């Protein structure tokens, strides 16, 4: 039964719903003839089929216009003389208006030029079309009711399936390749994070070394800033050294002042004794003492020229203290000369003070030179350690890059090998299928394989 014969015959299908309109065409009376006022009408039933979910767009059906019904159900239905419209009518937007002549014979589908689309349903990956009272796959759709499928159709279907399988296999390989690339990117991100941590630690170490001492070999761009920092540190160290030197000089001056006070007190005692015994003689000044007034003291008495024990002496200035003791011993070895000279004794004390200061300055200069040499040695040692660490890091980074390159090439070769294996497997499967098809077309006798004759 053709889809154009009767739409009521398809009412039992669950995949569409049918709405019917009865279109009546009236012809005007012919006024050319006298008293001929008859009007003729033609009733055309039109069906609109609304597909359910999963089907194509709505389509139009047209009833049979022949006088005799071509379907048993259509013959059993009563004919309506007027237009019947369903409660749930659908707009007739697929109907193409064509001038119809009611005097002619009933027109066909080609004469009406109606746009007809058969119903379609898509299930999984296949499309089904309703044709000749049954649902048929779109790939297996018949062109006419007398069409008989041939082997070429199945061959085409088989090729389509093979193409679909090839596409699925290719998609699978692409997904695997994408997975491998994602894994490789994840590993590279981890390696970059590790290298970044190493680089940050190295930069922090370089910053600490720069704060200690400048490194012109590694930081040529920051030479000016490092020089300024070095100058500031040198100025601070020099100021600290000057402060320590001033402190030492103050302590030495304090010790010398105490020594002079002790000498003055010791010289004043014999003057008082001489004044009490000999009142006639004038009181001599402490600077005009006789030569025999300063004998060597006893073994239990301390010498007035010895350095007091309570004086603070830094442990690092042993040479300075030794020189000071030598100067004090030289001063104590010449007491008679100072007494004989009398008045010029004080200038000699100032000269000894000046000599001590000069010696202290020379010792401070030597100590500063030694400290600067020690600082330079420490800087050189730190620079050598930094160079060794940098060389080790560069070597490790180079080995790491070579290892990454080898891993990447290995992964690439594995992917290529897998693609080749898949291609060979696919070609082998196709060859087997072709051999089976050839055996299917061959007669029964030739199906038995024969051994090839030896030449």
Curated annotation (Swiss-Prot):
Segments forming a coiled coil: 160-197, 240-266, 350-421
Phosphoserine carried by residues: 41, 86, 89, 97, 124, 144, 148, 150, 211, 225, 276, 332
Region Disordered, annotated ranges: 267-318
Keywords attached to this entry: Coiled coil, Phosphoprotein
Biased composition (Basic and acidic residues): 270-291
InterPro entries reported in the protein's UniProt record: Chibby_fam
Keyword Coiled coil listed: yes
UniProt family annotation: Belongs to the chibby family. SPERT subfamily.
Protein name per the record: Protein chibby homolog 2
């Amino acid at each position: 039964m053709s889809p154009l014969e009767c739409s009521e015959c398809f009412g039992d299908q669950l995949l569409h719903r049918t709405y019917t309109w009865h279109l009546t065409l009236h012809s005007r009376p012919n006024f050319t003839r006298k008293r001929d006022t008859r009007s003729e009408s033609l009733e055309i039933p039109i069906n609109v089929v609304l597909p359910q979910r999963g089907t194509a767009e709505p389509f139009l059906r047209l009833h049979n216009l022949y006088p005799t019904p071509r379907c048993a159900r259509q013959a059993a239905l009563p004919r309506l003389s007027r237009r019947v419209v369903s409660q749930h009518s659908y707009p007739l937007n697929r109907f193409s208006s064509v001038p119809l002549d009611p005097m002619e014979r009933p027109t066909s589908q080609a004469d009406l030029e109606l746009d007809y689309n058969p119903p379609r349903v898509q299930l999984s990956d296949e499309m089904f079309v309703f044709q000749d009272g049954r649902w048929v796959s779109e790939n297996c759709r018949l062109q006419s009711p007398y069409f008989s499928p041939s082997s070429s159709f199945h061959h085409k279907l088989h090729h389509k399936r093979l193409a679909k399988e090839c596409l699925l296999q290719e998609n699978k390989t692409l997904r695997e390749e994408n997975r491998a690339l994602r894994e490789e990117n994840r590993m590279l991100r981890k390696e970059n994070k590790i290298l970044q941590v190493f680089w940050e630690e190295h930069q922090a170490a370089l910053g600490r070394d720069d704060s200690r001492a400048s490194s012109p070999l590694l930081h040529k761009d920051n030479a000016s800033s490092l020089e300024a920092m070095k100058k500031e540190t040198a100025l601070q160290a020099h100021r600290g050294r000057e402060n320590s030197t001033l402190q030492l000089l103050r302590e030495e001056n304090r010790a010398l002042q105490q020594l002079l006070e002790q000498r003055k007190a010791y010289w004043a005692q014999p003057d008082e004794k001489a004044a009490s015994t000999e009142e006639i003689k004038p009181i001599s000044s402490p600077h005009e003492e006789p030569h025999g007034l300063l004998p060597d003291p006893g073994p239990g008495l301390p010498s007035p020229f010895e350095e007091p024990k309570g004086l603070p002496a830094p442990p690092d200035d042993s040479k300075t203290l030794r020189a000071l003791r030598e100067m004090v011993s030289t001063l104590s070895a010449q007491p008679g000369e100072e007494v004989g000279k009398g008045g010029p004794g004080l200038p000699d004390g100032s000269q000894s003070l000046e000599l001590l200061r000069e010696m202290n300055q020379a010792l401070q200069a030597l100590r500063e030179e030694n400290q600067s040499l020690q600082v330079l040695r420490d800087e050189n040692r730190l620079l050598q350690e930094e160079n060794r660490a940098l060389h080790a890091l560069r070597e490790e980074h180079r080995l790491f890059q070579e290892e990454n390159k080898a891993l990447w090439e290995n992964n690439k070769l594995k992917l290529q090998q897998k693609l080749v294996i898949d291609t060979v497997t696919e070609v082998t499967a196709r060859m087997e299928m072709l051999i089976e098809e050839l055996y299917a077309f061959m007669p029964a006798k030739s199906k038995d394989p024969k051994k090839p004759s030896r030449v």
